Every structure is written in structure tokens, then in C-alpha cells.
Amino acid sequence: MLSLVLTVFFVHVAIYLVNTIGASTIDSLLWLLYLKLPTPTSRTARKQQQLKRQVLEQKHEMNSTSSQDEFAKWAKARRRHDKSMEEYEALNKTLTAQKSSFDWTVKIARWLSTNGLKIFLQFWYSKTPVFPLPEAWFPYYVEWIVSFPRAPLGSVSIHVWSNVCATTIALTAEVMGALLVQIVGQKKEQRETAPVSAEGKKAQ
């Protein structure tokens, strides 16, 4: 079983990833993955896509047929198109309702597994020391601050550890992002200067 130290840390990693990537992006990705599963919803989605292609093909056929010179053929194509369009719109409404229900379920599950879990842990373990401080290393006021609000004096409370994790993760991600941008910029600069150097040697 994970210790309280790692549990709180991983919860904050999850919260940071959700906030960075974006809840809507995660919801869309999970929806696409859900549609890959053998469920009634995925079958509805496949049928909707088939009808969409069928509607476009029938519309193209109808537009390429003259309503004056070939009225009977055009009218038949129009009836087929209208029927397919009705089926497509009905399936689209069904799929939209299913997606709304899916998004709501995912939203609840995401909150419970991130912020909800964080709040629960802070409440449930409010009096539990996350880890003890070395004896006589810190003055009284420091021990009081890091044990705030309800942990035993001389230990780190879950509230303080939670804030430390959130700050550390955010700063680490920011530093890594800055380093990545710098590395990519240097490589791009090297690629741009390489052809210039080669042309200079040829000219000599």
C-alpha cells in the first residue's frame, strides 16, 4: 500500500495533469476510447458515420441530377436523401444525449479521484503526521507552522505536505518546460546555421 507521502504526491500530479492538459481534452480522448469498445453507443456512432457518408453521397447525386430534365430521377434521389437525413438526425440526437451523460459521469469520476480525494485525505488524516521532523533541528515556531492545523507538534501535517507537493510539481514542470523550449530552440538554430556553413565551405 502506498504511504501517505506518495499518495498525496500522486494525487497532486493527477490534479496538475488535468489542469494542464485540460478537462475537455481529457473528456474528448476518453470519449474516443469509449467508442472503440464493443458497446451499444459505439454501434450507434458507427451507424451515424455510415449515414453521414450516405447522406453526403445522396446529396452529391441529387445535385448532379437536373430537377428539370430528369425530374423523376431527381425526386427519387431527394426522397432517399430526406429519409437518410431523418435517420441521421435521430441518431445524432441519441448520440449527443449519450455523450452528455458520458461527460457528466467522467466529470464526477475525475473530481472524486482528484480534488475530491484530496479533500477527503486532508479531512481524514488531519491529525495524522505525514512524517516526523528530526528532533531539535527546528525552532518551535517552525514546528508549529509545519504541523498546522491539527498534526502533532514536531511533524508535518497533510495540509502543509499537500501545499509543498502542489508547489514543487508546478515549479518542476515550469523548469522542465523552459529547458525543453531552450533545447528545441538550440537544435533549430543548429539546423538553420548548418546549411549556411556548408555553403560557405563550398564557396571557398
UniProtKB/Swiss-Prot annotation:
Disulfide bonds: none annotated. One of its GO terms (cellular component) is endoplasmic reticulum membrane. Its main location: endoplasmic reticulum. The keyword Endoplasmic reticulum applies. Residues 43-99 form a coiled coil. Pfam families: CHD5. Keywords: Coiled coil, Endoplasmic reticulum, Membrane, Transmembrane, Transmembrane helix, Transport. Residues 25-110, 173-204 are cytoplasmic. It is found in: Endoplasmic reticulum membrane. One of its GO terms (molecular function) is protein-membrane adaptor activity. It comes from the Eukaryota. Residues 1-4, 132-155 are lumenal. It is a multi-pass membrane protein. Gene3D superfamilies: Helix hairpin bin. GO terms for biological process: tail-anchored membrane protein insertion into ER membrane. The chain crosses the membrane at residues 5-24, 111-131, 156-172. Required for the post-translational delivery of tail-anchored (TA) proteins to the endoplasmic reticulum. Acts as a membrane receptor for soluble get3, which recognizes and selectively binds the transmembrane domain of TA proteins in the cytosol. Belongs to the WRB/GET1 family. Interacts with get3. PANTHER family: GUIDED ENTRY OF TAIL-ANCHORED PROTEINS FACTOR 1, TAIL-ANCHORED PROTEIN INSERTION RECEPTOR WRB. This is Protein get1. It comes from Penicillium rubens (strain ATCC 28089 / DSM 1075 / NRRL 1951 / Wisconsin 54-1255) (Penicillium chrysogenum).
